[in-house]
């Protein structure tokens, strides 16, 4: 199941803001960029819901896999984890999260991918 629209990050201005104003957390398989939310940037993209909630974007480059099917599977795995653990996410401080998967062969090892994703969520204090 996909992430709800009010939890998605879109637009180049949003990503530029995250790259400039974020804390970066590195893992072996992925990096997290966590920034304070800024709803004013969302207004420039004509989004109807500009609430100050937790939002996320998952970016998987072609270096990870040339096949879009495999990249989408990885994205769906991470989105599924987010949706099942949404109650654990720290909502009293609104953040934007950008997840970048690094180059590596982890397509066959779903548990390793999810373990590192959860560890980085704890490390970035998005989950208590």
Curated annotation (Swiss-Prot):
Tell me the GO molecular function terms. 3'-tRNA processing endoribonuclease activity; ribonuclease P activity; tRNA binding
Name a biological process GO annotation.
tRNA 5'-leader removal
Q: What are the protein's UniProt keywords?
A: Endonuclease, Hydrolase, Nuclease, RNA-binding, tRNA processing
What cellular-component terms does GO give this entry?
Answer: ribonuclease P complex
- Class in the EC hierarchy, top level: hydrolase
User: Which InterPro entries would you find in this protein's record?
Assistant: Ribosomal_Su5_D2-typ_SF, Ribsml_uS5_D2-typ_fold_subgr, RNase_P
Catalytic activity of the protein? Endonucleolytic cleavage of RNA, removing 5'-extranucleotides from tRNA precursor
Its EC number is 3.1.26.5
Q: Which domain of life is it from?
A: Bacteria
Quaternary structure per UniProt? Consists of a catalytic RNA component (M1 or rnpB) and a protein subunit.
Q: Which family does it belong to?
A: Belongs to the RnpA family.
Instruction: Briefly state the protein's biological role.
Output: RNaseP catalyzes the removal of the 5'-leader sequence from pre-tRNA to produce the mature 5'-terminus. It can also cleave other RNA substrates such as 4.5S RNA. The protein component plays an auxiliary but essential role in vivo by binding to the 5'-leader sequence and broadening the substrate specificity of the ribozyme.
Instruction: Check the record and name the HAMAP family matching this protein.
Output: RNase_P
The protein depicted here goes by the name Ribonuclease P protein component
